[in-house]
Curated annotation (Swiss-Prot):
GTP binds at residues 41-49, 60-66, 90-94, 148-151, 176-178. A motif (Effector region) lies at residues 63-71. This is Ras-related protein Rab-5B. The lineage of its organism: Eukaryota, Sar, Alveolata, Apicomplexa, Aconoidasida. InterPro entries: P-loop_NTPase, Sigma_54_int_dom_ATP-bd_1, Small_GTP-bd, Small_GTPase. It comes from Plasmodium falciparum (isolate 3D7).
């Protein structure tokens, strides 16, 4: 009798709609969010080394010139617990590859502009690279200037660089692709800014 009674109380759940809160829905949407990031800067400043350390946790002393662009991907967990999938395009910085760079700016939500903190010429090129992404990239692209090789004696004054970045309205961080200092932090900060600035667009483009 007990068995019969419990059977009569069973109901089908296939037509039941599960209601989630706005916060839960945002987290679900953000978990499937994919964003494109471009790495820019002169040849030899350490763009590939930064990407290598982020994605594989290692550093290589061998310098290999990036021809055109290299593609990597990495997941970043945001403060709200959601995951953002970064599609990272590491562009070649040599003069002969510069004409190809704008091809990779399209649809980029973020740009990491790298210079060598021990190379004044690479700092002088920052203006060129920032103008490149502002002129040829998407509107309101999140730009972060990165001083690489922090593990070496510094030839450039950080305060001067910070002032330059304030004038350009871009973010700034120092890092070392050799020791790994601030590598993850810089991409976490960039991902957070992209999420804050573009979350409505990202949800629309990543249903």
């Amino acid at each position: 009798m007990g068995c019969s009674s419990s059977t009569e109380r069973l109901t089908s759940t296939k037509n039941i709609n599960i209601v989630t809160s706005p916060a839960q829905q945002q987290k679900k949407n953000a978990q499937d969010t994919k964003v494109k990031i471009v790495l820019l800067g002169d040849s030899g400043v350490g763009k590939s080394s930064i990407a290598l350390y982020l994605c594989h946790g290692r550093f290589s002393e061998k310098h290999q010139v990036t021809i055109g662009a290299a593609f990597l991907h990495h997941n970043i967990e945001l403060k709200n617990g959601a995951t953002m999938k970064l599609h990272i395009w590491d562009t070649g910085g040599q003069e002969r590859f510069r004409s190809m760079a704008p091809l990779y700016y399209r649809d980029a939500y973020g740009a990491v502009v790298v210079y060598d903190s021990n190379n004044v010429e690479s700092f002088d090129s920052l203006k060129y690279w920032i103008n490149e992404i502002k002129s040829n990239g998407p509107r309101n692209c999140c730009i972060m200037v990165v001083a690489n090789k922090k593990d070496l004696p510094q030839k450039l004054n950080s305060e001067m660089v910070m002032k330059f970045c304030e004038q350009e309205n871009v973010s700034f961080i120092e890092c070392s692709a050799k020791t790994g200092e601030n590598i993850t932090t810089l991409f976490e900060k960039l991902a957070s800014r992209i999420y804050s600035r573009f979350k409505e667009v990202l949800y629309y483009n990543n249903p």
